[in-house]
Amino acid sequence: MEIYEGKAKKMIPLDEDKFIMEFKDDATAFDGVKKAKFVGKGWLNAQISAKLFKLLEDHGIKTHFIGVAGGNRLIVERLEMYPIEVVVRNVVAGSLKKRLPLPEGYELPEPIVELYYKSDELHDPMINYYHARILGISEEEIKEMERIALKVNEILKKFFREKGIILVDFKLEFGKNKKGEIVLADEISPDTCRFWDVETKKSLDKDVFRFDKGDLIEAYKELYKRLIGEEPQI
């Protein structure tokens, strides 16, 4: 069975219904132009993702998460993946600064949901419902992904606020299971989210690497400690 490898993870077939999702220590930014390797990053992302998937499952969100296979590996359900990313934004940051006349850090009165087509070659362009239909994704499917994404946002915002963290924005991916249900997939980690400390607005995510803001592993360890309540064993 074929192993699928991306920039940050490997998907290793376990059987007809499951994959091992292995998180790598590699970090990339700006469409792969900036690259580095950080020992322990894969372990931290796997453990943080597992914690957040469990939290969401406890709140009734269907995810592909099955269990932890140890270290930097999770066991996940095999899905038919949609070729889009759903981004939810609570605070102005990143590319949103270029599209709205609002300062960085401005707290939005309501979340913004955006759709992006997954394509390295096209640099993940933003799309809308019309584009999605051309890609074979119905309006009903998009609306269900948006509904789930907003529910995820509601759960995670509250959880992170209690840990002294602002959930600035995040990216989700979805797939369809054998029952035809739309299921949350991929990962939820500091690689795919923006997290700021409530008091200092210090980044606790991949922006630390992207913009040379400090030590990436120390930022990820700090996030882990706040979420899990103990020192990471790496």
UniProtKB/Swiss-Prot annotation:
Entry keyword Zinc: no
EC number: 6.3.2.6
Annotated keywords: ATP-binding, Ligase, Nucleotide-binding, Purine biosynthesis
Gene Ontology BP, a term: 'de novo' IMP biosynthetic process
UniProt KW Ligase keyword: yes
Pfam families on file: SAICAR_synt (PF01259)
Protein's recorded name: Phosphoribosylaminoimidazole-succinocarboxamide synthase
Organism, as annotated: Pyrococcus furiosus (strain ATCC 43587 / DSM 3638 / JCM 8422 / Vc1)
